[in-house]
């Protein structure tokens, strides 16, 4: 049976732990964010906060240690947990997209035995992963794909990287019961955003000054995932990040980055193009910018508002910082 985006939300929850408290924490390259929802009403945000990080404290990498000073980062995390009055012993955690490898595999079928499934998926990841896949934690979700095949979404993280984040919270007496990439966490908000009008295909673009992640959902199945990290490139040559240039180049460069995604989708599935594009950026695009992207892509383009899923939230900076808080909001929402 083909899944709708609403069913996709239920499927993605296999990545989440429903028994976890409605608390989401994200550790990014340049900030730590935390969100706590009302445990009885997932549409109420009770507390949220973002704390900037000094440069170099968190260095996202697939194969190298991510945290340069666990003691300093622990101090920041402890402070933000106090601000948001998070007192639970278990949380959900989002880590940088650049610290986790997400891939999609088209398979005729998966073995019935869990050990055989793990072996098959690790074997497929072996040639494209810059670390020993046997020294990594692998999660996956199987989705119906085109032509009766399976689309298997895998999320793999090097164990040394994973344990750095786990130890950070263990030192505070907290278990990170579920850990995933920031963009996968934010994806939890999509089914609720599209609840009123479900398109056949959707492109979600999550951008920051130094990175871009693009995901395409076709008939409820994740068929495309692409992450680009420009931080190291900018560090080497001093270049302005390509995704968000100044002097009016922002939208042109954003389209240049998502154009290959659209072409891949059309070529792979033989379709005319995506129906809708959601943009999740630190600042909402202006109406004229959305219109330009719509003309370039041939799709309806809108800012994705993470707060659309919530009926109430504390006054203050949350509406301004909503896009930065999207992964934490998605994690907390995914606990229900």
How would you label these PLM feature ranges?
Residues 1-336:
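Hydrophobic/aromatic-enriched cytosolic interaction surfaces used to assemble or bind macromolecules
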């Amino acid at each position: 049976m083909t899944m709708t985006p609403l069913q996709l939300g239920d499927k993605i929850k296999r990545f989440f732990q429903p028994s976890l408290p409605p608390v989401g924490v994200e550790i990014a390259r340049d900030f730590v964010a935390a969100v706590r929802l009302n445990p009885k009403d997932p549409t109420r945000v009770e507390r949220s906060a973002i704390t900037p990080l000094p440069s170099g404290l968190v260095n996202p990498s697939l194969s190298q240690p991510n945290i340069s000073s666990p003691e300093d980062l622990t101090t920041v995390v402890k402070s933000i947990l106090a601000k948001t009055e998070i007192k639970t012993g278990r949380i959900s955690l989002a880590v940088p997209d650049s610290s986790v490898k997400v891939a999609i595999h088209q398979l005729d079928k998966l073995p019935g035995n869990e050990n055989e499934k793990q072996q098959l998926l690790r074997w497929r990841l072996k040639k494209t992963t810059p670390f020993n896949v046997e020294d990594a934690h692998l999660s996956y979700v199987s989705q119906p794909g085109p032509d009766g095949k399976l689309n298997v979404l895998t999320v793999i993280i090097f164990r040394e990287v994973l344990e750095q984040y786990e130890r950070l919270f263990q030192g505070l007496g907290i278990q990170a019961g579920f850990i995933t990439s920031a963009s996968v966490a934010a994806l939890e908000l999509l089914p609720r955003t599209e609840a009123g009008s479900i398109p056949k295909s959707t492109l979600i673009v999550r951008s920051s000054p130094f990175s871009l992640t693009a995901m395409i959902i076709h008939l409820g199945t994740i068929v495309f995932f692409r992450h680009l990290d420009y931080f190291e490139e900018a560090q080497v040559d001093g270049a302005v990040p390509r995704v968000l240039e100044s002097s009016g180049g922002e939208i042109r460069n954003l389209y240049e980055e998502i154009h290959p995604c659209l072409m891949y989708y059309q070529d792979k599935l033989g379709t005319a193009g995506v129906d809708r594009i959601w943009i999740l950026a630190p600042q909402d695009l202006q109406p004229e910018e959305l219109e330009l992207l719509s003309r370039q892509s041939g799709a309806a383009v809108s800012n994705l508002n993470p707060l659309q899923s919530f009926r109430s939230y504390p006054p203050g900076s949350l509406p301004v910082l909503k896009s930065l808080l999207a992964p934490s909001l998605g994690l907390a929402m995914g606990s229900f």
